[in-house]
Amino acid sequence: MTGQLVQYGRHRQRRSYARINEVLELPNLIEIQTASYDWFLEEGLREMFQDISPIEDFTGNLSLEFVDYSLGDPKYPVDEAKERDVTYNAPLRVKVRLINNETGEVKEQEVFMGDFPLMTETGTFIINGAERVIVSQLVRSPSVYYNEKIDKNGKRGIGATVIPNRGAWLEFETDAKDIAYVRIDRTRKLPITVLLRALGFGTDQEITDLLGENEYLRNTLEKDNTENAEKALLEIYERLRPGEPPTVENAKSLLVSRFFDPKRYDLAHVGRYKMNKKLHMKNRLFNQILAEPIVDPETGEVIAEKGEKLERKLLDKILPYLERAEDRFGESVLSPHEGVLEDEITIQSVKIIDPTDPNGERELTVIGNGGVTNDVKNITPADILSSISYFFNLLHEVGGTDDIDHLGNRRLRSVGELLQNQFRIGLSRMERVVRERMSIQDTSSVTPQQLINIRPVIASIKEFFGSSQLSQFMDQTNPLGELTHKRRLSALGPGGLTRERAGFEVRDVHYSHYGRMCPIETPEGPNIGLINSLSSYAKVNKFGFIESPYRRVDPETGKVTNKIDYLTADEQDNYIVAQANSPLDEDSRFQNEEVISRFQEDNIVVSRDKIDYMDVSPKQVVSAATACIPFLENDDSNRALMGANMQRQAVPLMKPQAPIVGTGMEYVNGKDSGAAVICHHDGVIERVEAKEVYVRRISIVDGKEVEGDLDRYGLQKYKRSNQGTCYNQRPIVSQGDRVTKGEVLADGPSMEDGELALGQNVLVGFMTWEGYNYEDAIIMSERLVKDDVYTSIHIEEFESEARDTKLGPEEITRDIPNVGEDALKNLDEHGIIRVGAEVTDGDILVGKVTPKGVTELSAEERLLHAIFGEKAREVRDTSLRVPHGGGGIVLDVKIFNREDGDELPPGVNQLVRAYIVQKRKIHEGDKMAGRHGNKGVISKILPEEDMPYLPDGTPIDIMLNPLGVPSRMNIGQVFELHLGMAARQLGIHVASPVFDGAREEDVWETLEEAGMPRDAKTVLYDGRTGEAFDNRVSVGVMYMIKLAHMVDDKLHARSTGPYSLVTQQPLGGKAQFGGQRFGEMEVWALEAYGAAYTLQEILTVKSDDTVGRVKTYEAIVKGDNVPEPGVPESFKVLIKELQSLGMDVKMLSSNEDEIDMRELEEEEVQAATKLNIDVEESE
């Protein structure tokens, strides 16, 4: 027997073909959501309040401080919030202190700051009753970036950008004449020396002394026509504020507010970290030759001689002298004068030999920012100086350019940070209001409550959850869709890219994605590469960079240890990493002398003693969904992409079956998705019911078991998911079972025995049959319909509300005008459908009448009024009816009344919701797929007796076209087919993990073990004639899923329906009950056939000839001849449009007489009045 047995949860055992031991458990897969939100509640909010307080008024008399905050209990639990269509939130209260600096009086008060949406255990938010997910956003990290530019003459230039988290950009660039320029906040460019003068280095000499002599600086100084700091400040002011009278003071305050004010300019933690890392001496001096000796400032000892090359060892030796807190080497303090800031600037500089000088004599000055501390969030003059120094160094090939698509330069903004940014906007709006109120109100009697207006804060949070591009309606088709949605990374959204502007490079797979972002799972279409998925083992660090785990290799012994280090993309660039499948001996050392490994973007073969790290697992490259595809290594990546995406569209079936050939990820994905019920504490099952499971906690105290509390776990029964599929949980534990923390107590939708079960294991043959599986179509046996193998349950929600109108309130009633008793048979006394009733298209669900405007009564109506009194009141029927294709069984009805204290939108008195459930069997036109991107539409369902059968008489379930395999290169499906057949014969489930699964030889051996031929082909007999087919056929078990694209949702036909108001043409699309567009090319087709009358009919009476179409309808009903068509409405619209452009357009008849449009219209109105239709109103 090949492989070993692995237990997944309580119920499932699989034979795994994995050869590599798992060193690291998979992390909790929705940690990216929950951890980020916890950070926000613990630290993010506190940071915000610290940033904003104290708020002082303009005179400095009053100051308002935010001391502490607390979150109360949510008003409704999660389930009730969903049911009542409200947000699941908790009240946020803040302790505020108001200090009167004149009198010294202090007032403390707790202020309510609005309700704050809470995250559920499963990483989602309930907003207005709907479950939503906040997708993490991939953005460029704030830092300084250098890039190489080649101009149109092929000359090399350098560009640099300082990007903050928020605030003005600072850009440096060179031009064809070798002059260095700066742009401040995307304005016109200025010579770079103007900025240096404005910082307080006024003369040419000072600038040259500071940055060192070089030709770029010389050219720039020649171009610069300002001579001192004052002129430079005025020059900058004129660029930033053209048209305003410049003064030195204004210029200084403008620059201070643009760059040096922490409220306006923010690099954030991550920006400061990246900036210090980029401008640090270490990487800049590597492999350079010193132009001055490095001396210990304390002792005067020479550590490195002039002319020595700073290789790794020497660099490590001098680092302590460059980095220590005091007496650093090369540190100097500059005192700028007349500049923006008068403060002293601490920098660090080292002289090296210019590597581009052939004689090796010219010196370069490398200036560092003197290690600005991590708590300085704004840019400092030292940062600007050292980034300009780096810029000039780079022109002499010292330092390196940055790749902006590298994951070391892109970071994630998860829920917590996105919320924090939104909250900050609300708070800063509130701050303005507080300041204004401070100056208006009486300072002696004012309280904090009177100053604070919480509206802007609430509004900004509401706006974020309700309408941000990153707050999305959760994909709840099945648990995998739910899980993937929570782990999604989007480069779109506010502050990100746009689809149209994103180029090819951003979308492409980058070497730094390895183990961080899945190279497979991304949508097809305009968003390809902009929306990605987090890899299975990846984590996000405190700066928002994605880290991947690696096993450390002990440098002394060469052993691969089980010590795991999480590395970010730029940390990993310093190491050589071996693949997870490198063979190890018993001592955990590499078997081979030479090992295939990765270093930055290259795959290299190196000797084993040079390796620093080793991959944790072969599946760390791919995402949770991709890791569910067995034999992924045998599929072409384009098809694997489709396979990963289509699994998310699988509809939950009535009788789910876990795959016979799995990958071992099914259990983890099911458990972490949030669809299953998970046990929170160790214990014993006391009671199991369909709707709840009771667990008695058990803890060990002094070696004895002690019983604790009884926990109740509620189960969701037949609820509607966001996508209208059925969300149902079934217990999989029994009374008396011992359970541990984290164990699955109940399966969710699309789960079986704790494992993800998206489809069914069916017997598949690769063969053609009468041409029915042409173009990927699928032929299916009727058994799958009869036995409900692919039957799914769908629940749709319909609602009707009774509002107050100008003419009086609407009423929900059984008394509906002009409706027979037959239509009311399933309604109760209030006019609401009874639960359990079977309804079809057009049936009434909720009877409702709306008051009509009072019209002039005819004589007969007046007589009726006189006889029956007020009975014949004017109401019209506005009942809620079942739409086309919406028929089914009424599952549940919910009624909300304003009188009962239910929260309803303004103007609504009563709300009724009806849930209709449909049981959809599979039929022709439904879309199905395997896990390898092999998708198709069912073209024929054959009776069982007509299906080809095996020698033992078993008819096969599905026939697929063999031509779908070779050109698509998804051979994984063939391996799955064979291994599945062998596993079914042996009565086992197997696991073939990605990149470490069953090899070809393993499959053949398992087939032999099952007593089958090695090529896994078999003779098939035609079910109709009983004769054997000419050739043997590959038959086996494949896991096939039914996708959410069902023909019932798409099939549509229209007789008459609504028309567009302006053109009077039928609307388009199923949702609007629209027609089919007969376009330009279709018109040509009918012209080619000479079918003039058909064409005229289609363009007039079937479309927008308003009177003609009613006359035609009348003629058909009465059996008369169809009348002559009139003038189409769109033709009149065209004429009007041309006339509105000032053209004189006239219509002429065949004998050249002018036709007056007005007369035509009057005739139409007369005809319309005869026919009793309203031309003005669209039908």
Swiss-Prot record:
Q: Name one Pfam family in it.
A: RNA_pol_Rpb2_6
Q: Which GO terms describe its molecular function?
A: DNA binding; DNA-directed RNA polymerase activity; ribonucleoside binding
Instruction: Name the reaction it catalyses.
Output: RNA(n) + a ribonucleoside 5'-triphosphate = RNA(n+1) + diphosphate
Q: EC annotation?
A: 2.7.7.6
What's in the keyword line of the UniProt record?
DNA-directed RNA polymerase, Nucleotidyltransferase, Transcription, Transferase
The domain of life is Bacteria
Gene Ontology, cellular component aspect = DNA-directed RNA polymerase complex
What biological-process terms (Gene Ontology) are attached?
DNA-templated transcription
Function according to Swiss-Prot or TrEMBL: DNA-dependent RNA polymerase catalyzes the transcription of DNA into RNA using the four ribonucleoside triphosphates as substrates.
Please describe the quaternary structure of this protein. The RNAP catalytic core consists of 2 alpha, 1 beta, 1 beta' and 1 omega subunit. When a sigma factor is associated with the core the holoenzyme is formed, which can initiate transcription.
Q: Which family does it belong to?
A: Belongs to the RNA polymerase beta chain family.
Q: Which protein, by its recorded name, is this?
A: DNA-directed RNA polymerase subunit beta
Name its species. Oceanobacillus iheyensis (strain DSM 14371 / CIP 107618 / JCM 11309 / KCTC 3954 / HTE831)
